[in-house]
Amino acid sequence: FAFLGGQRQRYAYWGFEACGTQTSFSWNQANLKHGPKPEEKERIRLLPIPLSMPQNRGDENLVRAGEAAGQAEQAKLTMLAWELYRRESVQVRREPERFLDILCSWGARPYACIRQGAFAGYVALCVDPKRDRAEIKEMVLEKGVSAKAVLHGLADSLGIRQGTVTVDYGKQEMMRELEEICESQNLGWGHRFLIMDWPRVLTAMLELKQYCSPLQEKEAVLGITEPSGKRTAVKIRVEAGKITVTGEERKEPRKGEIELTAAMAARMLFCSTQIYYKELEGIPESWFPLPLYVSEQDCC
C-alpha cells in the first residue's frame, strides 16, 4: 500500500482513501499533579539528540574536539533509537542514515529517554514555543518503560506540562497506562491510504490483530472492485489460529460474497465506524476494524 497526508478529496481522485485507526491521548498539568506518579526508579530524563554542532569561535583544537564528541553522541543515540524502532511490531522501512531526518519531519525534534543513566527509548516532539505544550509525534520505549514517566519527564526536563500523543494499536500496555492518567482520548482516522495488494495487507493486519486478541474462526469472501473496474475476490479464512488470505481476479460475483468498492472496503475494514455499516453482517466482529497505522513522521 501507499500512504500520504493532505486534503482528502485532492488525493481521493488518485484512489487514496481516508482510513486507518489511530488513538490520541491528551494530558494537562492537572493530570500530572493529581494523577498516578512514577516510582523513583522509573523516572525519565529527556536528553536532546543533537542535530548538529554549533560553530564556536575560539581554540580550533577545542572546537574540533567538541564537534567530534557531538557527532559521536549523535551517532550513538541515533543508532540506539533506530535499533529500538526496528523491533516495533508495525514499522516503515527507515534506513539508518535517514532515520534522524525522518524523526525531524513536521518540525519535530528527537529526544532520548534516559532511565537510571541508560537509554530507555525516544520521542519526537513538536513543541509550541509560546506555551508549555507539545505534540508527541512518535514515542518508542524499551519494554517495561513507563509512558506516564515520560510525560512527567517532559515536565521535569523541558517544562512541558500538556500535550497530545498518538499510539498505534499494537501498543496495548502503553494505551492502558495512558488511559489512567490522560484527560481525554480520541479515536480517528490515520492518513490517506491506497491499497494495492489486498491479500497481503489484510494478512498482515489480521495477524497483528490476532497478536493482540484472538480472532473468531470463519471463512468469508469479499468482492472488491477498483475504480478501473478490476474486481478481486478476496477469500479470508481463520482456522485453528491460522490466517489465510487469497485473491482471485474475476468479474462475476458468486453467492455469499460481499460486494464492496475499493473506497468502501478501505473505510469499512480499516475504520472504527465500520460498526455502523450493514454490509459486513455475517463477518465476525473480532476481525474488523483492522489496525492500519503508520507514524505521521513517515508521512512526509
Question: Can you annotate each of these PLM segments?
Answer:
Residues 1-11:
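Short, glycine/charge-rich beta-strand/loop segments that flank catalytic centers
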Residues 9, 15-34, 141-148, 152-300:
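Active-site/acyl-donor-binding loops of N-acyltransferases
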Residues 22-148, 152-164, 169-172, 184-193, ...:
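Amide-forming acyltransferase catalytic core, primarily the GNAT-like/NAT-type
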